[in-house]
């Protein structure tokens, strides 16, 4: 039995889970999410908890068991609390600003980079070197944060670029001067 898959998911008071055929719908105060289910797993709701079970013991069913348990868990957490990724910029002149819903980034290129997030993602800029990406879908929040980070990844010599909060950049030593 999957160690992760066998754990029940406790539902918060505000979250409601509905299972219909091969779809699971989770609704909460922050919004609603739905996920298609594969044939190898069975999702059931009882006593304020969601359980995920597998139909057989095939290798694929075992893999899907843990995966779908975490997907449902992330959906429940997303519609109740939400998810946030914090990006930090370091480098001379590197800054971000919000123009309406458009994120404008100055990253040392000859031009500014404009990024339009999807409607379900909220972007905040508390200060010019910090960007907060938040939403109810964990995968989408991570994907958008990775997209913003990809505009100027941290470089190993000076550490300039966009990095996640708490990310450790492996630094390299520059070329040694001649003898």
Curated annotation (Swiss-Prot):
SUPFAM superfamilies: Ribosomal protein L6 (SSF56053). GO terms for molecular function: rRNA binding; structural constituent of ribosome. GO terms for biological process: cytoplasmic translation. InterPro entries: Ribosomal_uL6-like (IPR000702), Ribosomal_uL6-like_a/b-dom_sf (IPR036789), Ribosomal_uL6_a/b-dom (IPR020040), Ribosomal_uL6_bac-type (IPR019906). Pfam families: Ribosomal_L6. The keyword Ribosomal protein applies. GO terms for cellular component: cytosolic large ribosomal subunit. Keywords: Ribonucleoprotein, Ribosomal protein, RNA-binding, rRNA-binding. Belongs to the universal ribosomal protein uL6 family. Part of the 50S ribosomal subunit. NCBIfam families: L6_bact. This protein binds to the 23S rRNA, and is important in its secondary structure. It is located near the subunit interface in the base of the L7/L12 stalk, and near the tRNA binding site of the peptidyltransferase center. This is Large ribosomal subunit protein uL6. The gene is rplF.
